[in-house]
């Protein structure tokens, strides 16, 4: 049985329209809450200078990530790895601090409880290294270095950033070499 449609129109006939009348359109930003799709593939980046890998949980097989490389994994696989305590993702504290593998998708990091909307995950990156080398006091530099660089992967990563970044402060580079026991 067909349904009866009733509609109202808000359009004016062309004859009624004033050509000098300004038409305003209200624009209001609407936040669209995206459903958290566990099948969506997201990028995972390794900070390690060596090949890393782990066994998949949700499907058969292994994941192999090349040195300083990336791989695309489903959100479901990442959440499963985190919930099973994979240290490559969870880092030294279980909250993603000083992790070897960094999830480049913010909603997935939030779902894994690695960060919130206001506080980012504690992981080494180029911006943190630049801020470290902008510290004026050598004492503050060393204390920040010791809190920022904890794991073996981070020690190799900071040396890679120094090689690529052309940092000119000899004393700070030597302090990093002494701490990491690696040479630039």
Which residues fall in each region the model found?
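N-terminal intrinsically disordered, low-complexity tails
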Residues: 7-32
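Charge/polar-rich, low-complexity and marginally structured segments
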Residues: 117-184
């Amino acid at each position: 049985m067909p349904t009866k449609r009733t509609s109202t129109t808000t359009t004016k006939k062309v004859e009624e329209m004033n050509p000098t009348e300004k038409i305003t359109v209200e624009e209001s930003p609407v936040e669209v809450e995206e459903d958290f799709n566990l099948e969506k593939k997201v990028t995972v980046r390794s900070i390690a200078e060596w090949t890393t890998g782990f066994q998949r949980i949700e499907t058969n097989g292994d994941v192999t990530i090349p040195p300083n490389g990336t791989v695309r994994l489903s959100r479901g696989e990442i959440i499963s790895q985190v919930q099973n305590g994979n240290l490559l993702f969870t880092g030294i504290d279980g909250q993603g601090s000083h992790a070897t593998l960094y999830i480049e998708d913010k909603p997935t990091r939030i779902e894994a409880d690695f960060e919130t909307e206001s506080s980012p995950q504690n992981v080494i990156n180029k911006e943190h290294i630049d801020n470290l080398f902008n510290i004026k006091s050598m004492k503050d530099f060393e204390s920040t270095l010791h809190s920022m660089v904890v794991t073996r992967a981070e020690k190799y990563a900071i040396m890679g950033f120094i090689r690529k970044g052309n940092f000119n402060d000899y004393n700070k580079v030597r302090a990093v070499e002494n701490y990491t026991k690696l040479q630039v």
